[in-house]
């Protein structure tokens, strides 16, 4: 069986140094992110959008095993612990944007 290749946690890397990696996620309505694993704790700040979903992979472990849908709250910041293999899906009618700060 071929080894699975995972993508990035967001669509564009903005900055990386010895302490953080800062990413931008930008998804058009109906678009999906790369399937990715969160190997670091991170802070997620929603910027724009109306509905977002996370679809876990079958081998995702811990608290990250259920499909979730959520309303987007622009300006809302959340601290999230590492773990999970997922794909983000913009299930809304508006463009979805977020900033994701991985903590090293």
Where are these regions (language model features)?
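Surface loops and adjacent helix of pleckstrin homology
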Residues: 25, 38, 57, 91, ...
